[in-house]
């Protein structure tokens, strides 16, 4: 799910002390071989999509500093690495992996902390406290307002069902409605691009829930 013109074959220049491309290649390989095949939504394809969107958003938001762009890109590629270890609390696990791994690639303690702050900001409810964190948060959930929302959300439904985290379609639509109601985009670029479509999608889901029949043949009140 890569955006044309925003792919991963155009690496960002990094300060020489950081072996960023090697760090990125390492985690992509780890995700490719280590993620569960039942991560239908949170697979490698999601990480690559988020990375591409994050870099596109950074350009649109006027981020030009080479180090900032490199740290954002690294954070995007590592933001779901915690799924290699756990499902619940994967953000914290991802940060632990970052702290263990990235010193070997020349990242300083301060750079690693900046990456972890970005990763932890993606934990729900999102609480980004910097421009880079806002960009990563918006990239992570960019699909909520995109034309490919349906197939992507279906993959999440399949993933949650496989883990028995939701019982049926009605619970799924309730979950979606609650999530879309409380979610917000952070960057001006994403608000302009995605917010209206996301709201229209929420309106359709709420209408669907309102028309959902009870077992007795009556309709739900939502």
Task: Describe the residue ranges of each PLM region.
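Divalent metal-dependent phosphate-bond-processing catalytic cores, especially two-metal-ion Mg2+/Mn2+ enzymes
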Residues: 5, 35-64, 78, 107, ...
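His-Asp-centered metal-binding catalytic motifs of divalent-metal-dependent phosphohydrolases/nucleases
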Residues: 50, 67-85, 90, 94, ...
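An amphipathic alpha-helix signature
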Residues: 24, 28, 51, 55, ...
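Non-catalytic interface/linker regions that flank or bridge core catalytic/transmembrane domains
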Residues: 2-22, 220-222
């Amino acid at each position: 799910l890569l955006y044309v013109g925003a792919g991963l074959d155009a690496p960002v220049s990094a300060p020489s002390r950081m072996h960023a491309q090697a760090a990125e290649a390492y985690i992509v390989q780890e995700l490719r071989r280590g993620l569960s095949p039942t991560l239908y939504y949170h697979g490698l394809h999601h990480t690559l999509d988020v990375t591409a969107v994050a870099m596109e958003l950074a350009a649109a938001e006027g981020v030009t500093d080479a180090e900032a762009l490199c740290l954002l890109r690294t954070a995007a590629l590592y933001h779901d690495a915690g799924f290699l270890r756990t499902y619940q609390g994967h953000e914290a696990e991802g940060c632990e992996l970052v702290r263990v791994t990235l010193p070997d690639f020349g990242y300083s303690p301060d750079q690693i902390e900046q990456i972890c702050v970005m990763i932890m900001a993606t934990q729900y409810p999102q609480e980004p406290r910097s421009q880079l964190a806002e960009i990563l948060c918006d990239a992570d959930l960019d699909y909520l307002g995109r034309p490919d929302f349906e197939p992507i959300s279906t993959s999440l439904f399949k993933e949650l069902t496989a883990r028995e985290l939701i019982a049926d379609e009605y619970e799924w639509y309730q979950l979606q409605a609650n999530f879309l109601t409380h979610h917000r985009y952070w960057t001006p670029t994403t608000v302009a691009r995605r917010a209206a479509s996301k709201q229209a999608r929420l309106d359709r889901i709420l209408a669907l829930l309102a028309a959902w029949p009870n077992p007795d043949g009556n309709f739900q009140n939502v």
